[in-house]
C-alpha cells in the first residue's frame, strides 16, 4: 500500500518535514517514491509554511495512495491558500 506522509528533517528544536509518497513498509526517513512538497511548522517572517504540488498529490490519491491524517489537513490548508491567492 502507498501512503502520503511526512518525513522529518531540520535541526534539533527546529523541525522541517518533507511530504512524500512512499510504501507503508518503508521507514519514516527511508526510501520514498516521490517528494511532493514540504511543511515548515516553525516558519518565521517571509518563510513559506506549506508548499505542495497539488496536481501530483491528486494524481497519487487517484491511483490509491492514502494520505495520513496530518497530511490530509495540510492538503486542505494548501488548497485554501492557493484558492485565496488566485
UniProtKB/Swiss-Prot annotation:
One of its GO terms (biological process) is translation. Gene3D superfamilies: 3.30.1320.10. SUPFAM superfamilies: Ribosomal protein S16. GO terms for cellular component: cytoplasm; small ribosomal subunit. Keywords: Ribonucleoprotein, Ribosomal protein. The keyword Transferase does not apply. One of its GO terms (molecular function) is structural constituent of ribosome. The keyword Protein biosynthesis does not apply. Belongs to the bacterial ribosomal protein bS16 family. NCBIfam families: S16 (TIGR00002). This is Small ribosomal subunit protein bS16. It comes from Stenotrophomonas maltophilia (strain R551-3).
Amino acid at each position: 500500500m502507498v501512503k502520503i506522509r511526512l518525513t522529518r528533517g531540520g535541526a534539533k528544536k527546529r523541525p522541517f518535514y518533507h511530504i512524500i509518497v512512499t510504501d507503508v513498509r518503508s521507514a519514516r526517513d527511508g526510501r520514498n517514491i516521490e517528494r511532493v512538497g514540504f511543511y515548515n511548522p516553525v516558519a518565521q517572517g517571509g518563510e513559506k509554511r506549506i508548499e505542495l504540488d497539488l496536481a501530483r498529490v491528486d494524481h497519487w490519491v487517484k491511483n490509491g495512495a492514502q494520505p495520513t491524517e496530518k497530511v490530509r489537513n495540510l492538503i486542505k490548508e494548501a488548497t485554501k491558500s492557493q484558492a485565496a491567492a488566485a
